Each structure stands twice: as C-alpha cells, then as structure tokens.
C-alpha cells in the first residue's frame, strides 16, 4: 500500500549545522482505493551535532472513502545528537466522513510530535467526524514522544450518530453536535476497547437542536472497565440551538460508562444578540417596503400624471429604482436592492382640475447584511404586491393623493453564530403579508422662468404581519408584526437647462414606529423575547437629477438621492414618459 502526503519535507544536516523545517497549510483528500499511512503534513529535521527544529502546522486530511492504515493530520519529528531539538504539531485536522480502516494496529492521529530527547508539543489539533464512516480505529488527539506538551486537542462529532471506534485518547476538548433525529437509547459515539475515557481537566460541550424533545440523550459510551473518568476541573456545557444553555444537564451515569445529557436542566436564555439578529431581517424587510413606497410616490406618480395627460384612456406608467441604505436599528442592517412600480393611469377632468386614478403592481428584490455586535447575518428579501391610487390636481397647483397596496414579502436569513468554543450555522426562511397606504398633499408652482417647484407632505403607513420560522438548528421563533408610520416633507425644483432640466430636492423624514422582536418558544411551553430593533428616528436627504427628451415622444429622468441620519446611503431612481 502506498503512503499519501499532503506536504512532505525532510532536512538532515551534518558538521554541527542546524536543521530546521516547517510544513504548513498542506492537505490531502482521499475518496477511494487502499492507502497505507496518510499524512496531511510531515516535517522531519535531523542534525548530527546542531539544533533540530520541525513543525507541522495547519495541515488537513479529508477521508471520504477508501481503506486506510494509520492517518496523521500533521506529524513533526526532530532529532539531534548534541544540540537542542523541538518538534511541534499544531492546528492540524483530520476530517472523517467515510472510509474503512484496517483495524489491527490502525490509528487516526490529529497531531503527532516526536522528539525523544527534546521538546515535543501537540496542541490545537482536531479530529472531526461527520457522515457514516466504517468502524474507526484508535482516535488520538495530540500525541507526543519526548518532553511532551499536549493541550487543547479536540474530538468533534458533528450531526451524526452510531459511530464506533476503538478509543478516544489525548483529547482535551470533546464537542458533540447532536443530530435532530438522535433518540433516547442511541449513542453518538461508542468505544470498544479496554482503554478508558479520561475527561479530567477536559472541556466537554454538547450542542442540542432547539427542537429536541427527548428527555435523555447519549453522547458517548464505552465498553472499557475503566469507564469514563472526570474530576473537579472537568467543564461540561450544554447549548440548546442558538438560544441558550442548560445548567447541570451533562453527567456520567451510575455505571460510569455513559456520558449523558438530560433536557430538564435549568435553561438560561443567552441568545439576546442572536435572537435580535434574527429580528433584524424583519426590520430590514419593512424598511425595504418603505423604499418601494417612496419610489412610487416620487417617480411613479409623476410618470402616471404625465402619461394620463397624453392619453384618452388608461395609459401605462413605470418607475424603477435601486438603493444601498443602512438603517440604524440600535444595531444596523444594510439593504441593497431594486424596486419597481408599474401600472395604468387614467385622467378625468372637471373644468381645469384633474382626477387621476389607476391600478399598480409593485415588486422589489434585495439583499441585506445585519450586524448585532459580533453576530453578522445576511440574506435576501423579496416582495410582490398590487394596489391602486388616486390623485387630484387643481389649477392653483395644489394636489391631494393617496394609495393602498397589499402583497407578500419573502425573507431568508443565514449566519454563523459563535456558541461556546465553536461556531453554529443557522438559517431560516419565512414570509409575511403586508399592507401599505399613503396620504399626501402638496403644491406645484411654475415660475416665470420655467422653474417648477413642488412642495409636499406625505404620510406612509406599512404593516408587515408577524411570521414564524423554525431555524435549521431547530429553534422555533415567532416574529412580531412591524408597524411603520413615516412622515416625510420636502421640496423639489425642476429647472430648465439647455438640452433638458436639472432636478434638485431635499426632504426630511421621521419614522414613528418600525419596532419588531423575535420570541423563542422552547419545548415545554416557556418563551423568551429578544431586544427590539427599531427604525424610529429622523432622516434627511438631498437629491440631484436630470430630465431630458430622448426622442420626440419620450422623456426620461434619472435622480440620485443621498440620505443621512437614521437612514443612510444612496438611492437611484429612473422613469420614462411616453406621449401617445
């Protein structure tokens, strides 16, 4: 059988010359066939009379299929006859998701430092087991020969069960991510040999799905007469989803051969930031609906008015915009996306006054990043809605307007959340109905030089209904409805120029609401509510744009609006007017 190396380096010196070698960041992936010894990284330094230094750092082995003998994530050997010597195996990882093993004399070693006459250090090495590999041999975290230091070497069993191995030795951390289908009486890891499991001074962590209802779960069991041993320095912690911890929930049973978790431990909700991060999605989605409403009342109604004036019946209109806005919520959420409003408008005249009305369709799609202290979430938001509008324009320039819209929003979320010594990935997707309305009043006045000034005051209401979601980690959350009340006033000038018209504008907006929250519902009936993100506060904007005739019967306009305050960033809008 052949040896397999991700990285392999050997140095031998004579005449008192020092020997130094490092192998870092190498990896090997095996999906089939038969292999002898497998090394993610191998470093060897030998000197007859000088110093010797060998290090294997950050190397990896991925075992996905095949047959193996002995596997090393990283191995360092140092030897000298007269000088000092150091061998370090650090930060190496063996990932096991498949394969079979020649059991007689086989072992899987995360990090091995061999230096019989000097210093040997094996630290921060990891064996991680996923999937359904065949029966495993001896599992060894950090092995040393010489004046050895073995510290913070970890065994991780992730979302799998029914794994068997000979033993688990020289680990200082044990991490169990329980699968959602782990039932009472099933073990995640079973050990066969007579070698006991030493948890003295070790950190043991269990990550349970938030949806788990089994009263008692088996993390580890051993057939060894020596059993599982602990001491006062053993630290056991149980995490439930991303939402909290269970106190005094992990223990070794009366036989001394099973490491168990029971769910009746005292629950402590520690997911304040995590839950608030989940709720940021709802706040961001409501703000995104508000961006769409602004697009319709600014560019959409202007286009509808112009189109209706040139047609005898219903005339189509459209407005499109894009924005990159940061919404301060106590933390913040950054939204990027596009909004579209299309519809038909019709004009009815009473003397010189005009009454405009018609149906509309609105659509938006965007992405977001939310930040709550160290928690960074991201995802997408989409909405689709229909509605109608009415607007009255008088000869003195006064106008009165209103609209009603309703539809559905879809949101998704994903984040890698720090829990204990590791990171837990969680995600969800959900949807919610929404309804929106606005009322506005203003006046358009045209000066003798052709400059048009529009002053307006508009009130916007948006309600995004509450929603529920079960996270990929099993936690069940309810999200409260978001009620947004925004008042916006501003002025816009359209000034004729050679080849077109310059658009300048400014506005002030105040959000009176926009609060939301996330509530965790724990199996058993208890619930815990997150801090509330809020969109409440002042924002201001400055706008500049250009309007020009593209052809004889078509005029286009584009505008850029910069925002500051509670809502910060830039929005871009564009519209087209056809004369029929």
Tell what function each PLM region has.
Residues 5-10, 24, 29-31, 39-44, ...:
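Feature marks extracellular polysaccharide-active and adherence modules
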Residues 269-453, 559-566, 571:
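Outer membrane beta-barrel translocator domains of Type V secretion systems
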Residues 387, 447, 476-580:
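Outer membrane beta-barrel transmembrane domains
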Residues 274, 330-332, 371-379, 410-431, ...:
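Solvent-exposed, glycine/polar-rich loop segments of beta-barrel outer-membrane systems
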Residues 28, 61, 94, 340-342, ...:
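Membrane-embedded beta-strands of outer-membrane beta-barrel proteins
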Residues 118, 124-218:
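Extracellular beta-strand/loop-rich repeat segments of large surface/secreted proteins
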Residues 234-272:
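Low-complexity acidic/polar repeat-biased segments
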Residues 3-12, 37-42, 46, 51, ...:
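Glycine-rich beta-solenoid repeat tracts in large extracellular/virion proteins
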């Amino acid at each position: 059988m052949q040896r397999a190396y991700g990285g392999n380096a050997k140095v031998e010196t004579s005449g008192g010359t020092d020997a130094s070698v490092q192998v870092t960041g190498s990896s090997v992936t095996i999906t089939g066939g038969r292999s002898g010894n497998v090394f993610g990284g191998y470093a060897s330094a030998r000197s007859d009379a000088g110093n010797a230094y060998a290090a294997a750092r950050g190397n990896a082995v991925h075992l996905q299929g095949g047959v193996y003998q002995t596997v090393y994530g990283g191995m360092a050997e140092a030897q000298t006859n007269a000088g000092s010597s150091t061998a370090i195996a650090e930060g190496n990882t063996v990932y096991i998701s498949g394969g079979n093993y020649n059991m007689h004399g086989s072992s899987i070693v995360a990090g091995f430092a061999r230096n019989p006459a000097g210093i040997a250090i094996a630290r921060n090495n990891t064996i991680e087991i996923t999937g359904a590999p065949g029966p495993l041999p001896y599992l060894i975290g950090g092995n040393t020969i010489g004046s050895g230091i073995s510290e913070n070497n970890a065994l991780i069993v992730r979302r799998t069960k029914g794994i068997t191995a000979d033993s688990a030795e020289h680990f200082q951390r044990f991490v169990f991510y329980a699968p959602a289908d782990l039932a009472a009486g099933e073990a995640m890891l079973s050990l066969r040999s007579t070698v006991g499991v030493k948890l003295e001074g070790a950190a043991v962590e269990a990550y349970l799905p938030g949806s788990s209802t089994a009263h008692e779960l088996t993390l580890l069991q051993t057939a060894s007469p020596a059993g599982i041993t602990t001491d006062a320095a053993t630290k056991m912690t149980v995490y439930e989803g991303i939402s909290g911890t269970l106190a005094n929930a992990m223990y070794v049973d009366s036989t001394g051969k099973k490491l168990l978790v029971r769910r009746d431990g005292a629950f402590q909700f520690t997911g304040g930031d995590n839950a608030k991060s989940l709720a940021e999605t709802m706040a961001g989605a409501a703000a995104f609906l508000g961006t769409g409403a602004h697009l319709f009342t600014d560019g959409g109604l202007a286009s509808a008015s112009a189109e209706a004036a040139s047609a005898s019946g219903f005339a189509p209109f459209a407005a499109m915009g894009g924005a990159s806005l940061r919404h301060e919520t106590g933390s913040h959420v950054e939204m990027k996306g596009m909004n579209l409003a299309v519809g038909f408008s019709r004009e009815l005249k009473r003397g010189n006054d005009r009454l405009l009305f018609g149906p509309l369709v609105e659509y938006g799609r965007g992405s977001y990043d939310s930040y709550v202290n160290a928690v960074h979430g991201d995802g997408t938001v989409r909405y689709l809605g229909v509605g109608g509008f009415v607007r009255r324009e008088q000869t003195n320039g006064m106008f009165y307007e209103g609209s009603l819209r309703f539809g559905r929003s879809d949101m998704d979320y994903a984040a890698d959340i720090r829990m204990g010594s590791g990171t837990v990935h969680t995600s969800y997707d959900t949807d919610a109905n929404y309804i929106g309305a606005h009322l506005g009043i203003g006046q358009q006045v045209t000066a003798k030089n052709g400059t048009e000034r529009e002053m307006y005051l508009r009130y916007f209401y948006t309600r995004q209904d509450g929603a529920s979601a079960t996270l990929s980690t099993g936690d069940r959350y309810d999200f409260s409805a978001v009620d947004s009340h925004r008042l916006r006033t501003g002025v816009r000038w359209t000034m004729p120029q050679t080849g077109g018209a310059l658009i300048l504008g400014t506005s002030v907006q105040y959000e009176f609401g926009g609060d939301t929250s996330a509530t965790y519902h724990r199996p058993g009936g208890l619930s815990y509510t997150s801090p509330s993100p809020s969109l409440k506060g002042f924002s201001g904007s400055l706008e500049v744009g250009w309007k020009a005739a593209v052809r004889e019967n078509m005029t286009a306009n584009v505008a850029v609006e910069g925002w500051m305050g509670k809502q910060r960033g830039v929005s871009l809008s564009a519209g087209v007017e056809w004369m029929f």
